[in-house]
Amino acid sequence: LAGRGQRVVVIERKQYPFHRVCGEYVSHEVLPYLRRLGADPAPLAPASISRFRLSSPAGRVLDSPLDLGGFGVSRYRLDEFLYQLALARGVEFVLPATVAAVTFDAATDRHQVTLADGRHLTARLVLGTYGKRSALDRQLDRPFFGQRSPYVGVKYHLRLAGFPRDVIALHNFRDGYAGISAIEDDRLCFCYLTTRDNLRRSGSVAALEGEVLAQNPHLAAILSSAERLYAQPEVINEISFAPKAPVEQHLLMVGDAAGLITPLCGNGMAMALQGAALVAPLANQFLRGQLPRLALEAAYARAWQQQFGTRLRVGRAVQGLFGGPVLSELVVGALRHWPAGVRALMRQTHGQPF
């Protein structure tokens, strides 16, 4: 939008760079878009990933090539890279700052954005790009916010000699699964999703890993051999996969704020970037007076559902097949003998280059 001559202000509650709970794998479907933006990730020296490995809780393994493949890069490095590019193009940043409320004034056709420190901003258009869950969701009275979610996410960066840098592996355990893949330098991203009950029964993250994750022999080998590069893991709670609306009270939601794909599909970052590619030209038309607000909202909601609706539904269905030890064993066993089924599931949860 800044490249199209629009004034853009980004409000971020942290100071760049910083770590996020994220699998840090990006499908190659995003590369044409990033290159059009002048944001080719090649200078970040990402890992090139072309193979997928899936294991059951007992350790049975399925290997498959990735049709498009992807790259691995930390959010710490990627977000800082995009932040510096945006600054160079005139984007204004207000940080560290937290949005307390966003209201819409129909009389002026403007949004009022209130920050936690009392400052106010006025905007013709607000894009909600704030991730999985925020106090703003409560203020907007979004239905999913009032529904307790059983899921928690944990992330580390690791160093592990001998781990293949072209593989993204997904290892199942009781009531959860863990992903591991290479990022820049000699690092690995290790990120897992499990339930609050699993964590509560174990009493701590360390006990959970030793008692539950390590029942999968592949995870046991990783946890016993890897060097952990954080003093403490990044942890997030209340991860909801419930359907969300892409437009809320005239805010256009993008990325996880619009809908969270289950992490086992490995496509959240690509979906966020594709959401940006969908919203930017429509927002530009609106800001130039070429598209009324209601037409903008309808066009974006329609495009979003067409692009992502099926992916999210398939992701929720696939997640239901994993976590339970017996069902996970059966599914992995069946897919080992049905490689076409594996490729079909991947196509249902990923898009084409854009």
Model-derived regions: residue spans:
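Glycine-rich FAD pyrophosphate-binding loop
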Residues: 2-22
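Short phosphate-binding/catalytic loops that engage adenosine nucleotides
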Residues: 6, 39, 91
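A conserved beta-strand/loop capping segment in the N-terminal third of enzymes
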Residues: 31-83, 104
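Short glycine-enriched, charge-decorated loop/helix-capping segments at active-site entrances
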Residues: 67-72, 142-144, 266-270
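Predominantly flavin-linked oxidoreductase catalytic cores and closely associated redox partners
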Residues: 85-222
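C-terminal helical "tail/cap" subdomain of flavin- and related membrane-associated enzymes
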Residues: 281-354
